[in-house]
């Protein structure tokens, strides 16, 4: 485990009160835990913006399965990015809609291109990405 370093933060009283309420509602044991999570999230977002670091995560999308050629297009795109795709999960949500969850690991730039290609397809109703740092 990494060495813990103590440091001080100056903050407006009302901002701190709001923060304390949120961390209590979420069940954090301390402000330090919550601040560490916020810093980790910020670092991951910056890595995403810089497009240089390696990350892991998931891309989820919802689409209509009966649209001619869409399933094949999704498969073709995934084969093009086989080097960053770890695994996929396909779920039939109802008679019309499917959900695909794609687990990814690799350079941010390539994962972002995969996400953008999937998001831009017509009849893909919703896409979402969740990433984390590879420690």
UniProtKB/Swiss-Prot annotation:
Comment on bound cofactor: Binds 1 nickel ion per subunit.
Binding-site list for Ni(2+): 79, 90, 92, 98
Annotated GO MF terms: DNA binding; DNA-binding transcription factor activity; nickel cation binding
Cofactor: Ni(2+)
Alphabetized SUPFAM superfamilies for the sequence: ACT-like, Ribbon-helix-helix
Disulfide partners: none
Pfam family for this entry, one: RHH_1
Keyword list, A-Z: DNA-binding, Metal-binding, Nickel, Transcription, Transcription regulation
GO terms (BP aspect): regulation of DNA-templated transcription; response to nickel cation
Entries under CDD domains matching the protein: RHH_NikR_HicB-like
InterPro entries: Acetolactate_synth/TF_NikR_C, ACT-like_dom_sf, Arc_rbn_hlx_hlx, CopG, CopG/NikR_regulator, Ni_resp_reg_NikR, Ribbon_hlx_hlx, TF_NikR_Ni-bd_C
Domain of life: Bacteria
Record family assignment: Belongs to the transcriptional regulatory CopG/NikR family.
Function: Transcriptional regulator.
Identification of the protein by name: Putative nickel-responsive regulator
Organism the protein comes from: Dictyoglomus turgidum (strain DSM 6724 / Z-1310)
